[in-house]
Structures are given as C-alpha cells and as structure tokens.
Curated annotation (Swiss-Prot):
<feature type="domain" description="DRBM">
    <location>
        <begin position="158"/>
        <end position="226"/>
    </location>
</feature>
<dbReference type="InterPro" id="IPR014720">
    <property type="entry name" value="dsRBD_dom"/>
</dbReference>
<dbReference type="Pfam" id="PF00035">
    <property type="entry name" value="dsrm"/>
</dbReference>
<protein>
    <recommendedName>
        <fullName>Ribonuclease 3</fullName>
        <ecNumber>3.1.26.3</ecNumber>
    </recommendedName>
</protein>
<keyword id="KW-0460">Magnesium</keyword>
<dbReference type="GO" id="GO:0006364">
    <property type="term" value="P:rRNA processing"/>
</dbReference>
<feature type="active site">
    <location>
        <position position="50"/>
    </location>
</feature>
<keyword id="KW-0479">Metal-binding</keyword>
<feature type="active site">
    <location>
        <position position="122"/>
    </location>
</feature>
<dbReference type="GO" id="GO:0019843">
    <property type="term" value="F:rRNA binding"/>
</dbReference>
<feature type="binding site">
    <location>
        <position position="122"/>
    </location>
    <ligand>
        <name>Mg(2+)</name>
    </ligand>
</feature>
<dbReference type="GO" id="GO:0046872">
    <property type="term" value="F:metal ion binding"/>
</dbReference>
<feature type="binding site">
    <location>
        <position position="46"/>
    </location>
    <ligand>
        <name>Mg(2+)</name>
    </ligand>
</feature>
<keyword id="KW-0963">Cytoplasm</keyword>
<keyword id="KW-0698">rRNA processing</keyword>
<dbReference type="InterPro" id="IPR011907">
    <property type="entry name" value="RNase_III"/>
</dbReference>
<dbReference type="GO" id="GO:0010468">
    <property type="term" value="P:regulation of gene expression"/>
</dbReference>
Amino acid sequence: MESFEKLEKLLSYSFKNKELLIEALSHPSLRQHHEYKDDKDYERLEFLGDAVLNLVITEILFRNFANYNEGNLAKIRSYLVCKETICMVGAKLTLKNYIIMTHGEEVAGGRDNLNNIENATEALIAAIYLDSNIETTHDIIEKLWAEFIKVQNLTDYDPKTALQEWAQASDHHLPIYRLIKREGASHSSTFTVLVKVKDYEQTGTGHAIKEAEKNAARSLLHRLKND
C-alpha cells in the first residue's frame, strides 16, 4: 500500500484529520479481522459522499449548462455519477493502491473490484467534506471530474439514448444489444457487446455490460456520422 502523502498530492489537499482519510479507505472486510481494533470502515462515509457528489455535480451542471432542460441535465448527471465514471476518477487517483483491506479480500481481487473503488472514491469525497467545507470539496470534485464535464455533446453522455433517437428518426427498428463475449475472472470481467441497427453493427467493451453497451452505441454513432 502506498503512502497517503502521494494521494494527498494527487488531490491537492492535505487532511487535517488523518483518521478521516484512514476511515475513508478502510474496507468493510477489516471488521471481521481479529487484529483490527477499530470498528470503522468506509460504508457510512460512502453514504454521505454519494449525496455530496450528487449535490456538487448538480450545481456544476446547473451553472455551466444553462441551455439544457431538466431532462438533459438529468441524463448528464446520471453519466457523471455512475459507477463507470466514479471508477475512472478513482483510477486517476490510483485509489486501489490505498484501500486498506484484509489479505483475504486482496487475494480475492479486492484491489481491482470496481465496487470497492467506487465506494472508496465516494467515501473519500465525504472525508474531504467533513475535514474541510463544501466549497473546498466542490473545487476538488470539479477538478477531478473536469475532463468528463467538458464533454458537452449529449451523444457522449448518453449514447444509447442518442442511438435510439437516431434509429427512430430514420424509421429504423430500435437498436438490439447482444452480449457476445465475456473474459476474465468474475470480479474483473471484460464484456463485449454487439449493437445492431438495420444493417449497421458495432461492438464495444467494458468492465460492466452497461458500459460495454454504451461504448458500442458510441462507436456506432461515430461510424454513422462519418459514413
């Protein structure tokens, strides 16, 4: 496990209360470990972090996307706070290297488990909020999510809806998605999905079926635009 100082540098934030940081990175498996003296793990912080993240992302979208209606804002927010995006932020922070877990959890692939990375990322947001204030937390979230927020094309946020709308506008049947391949262990599988609309088809991959479907839809949309 790497030192917390490296993580704080990536965050551009130094915790005043290091116990909050430790709690945010403590996997629930530790509660069953006889040598673990504390009964705290990241589950409660994750609950708070989810709410803080939703609030901050909602405010950012409301401020930056003045021409988008409520429906489109909701779709973009859904993309920004979904498991895949949160895990990409966690990957940027190399968060899997900092999660404190039992040896058994680690051997079972816990460091690459997307649920663990998502939960720890949300818990980390809550820890920053409790250690500082909403303004500081807002700035950190805006920085970490910047590359995703910059995408202003709804196609990139919600490619499945965009592809469905294209199919309907072109008088085609709705897109059909089919899982064609699954590779890897159960905790770190890679899925390949084929999407088909009329005579057009494209594949996409991801660590979840929904992610693979989105990537397939996005690839097909890009192909249709370039044809």
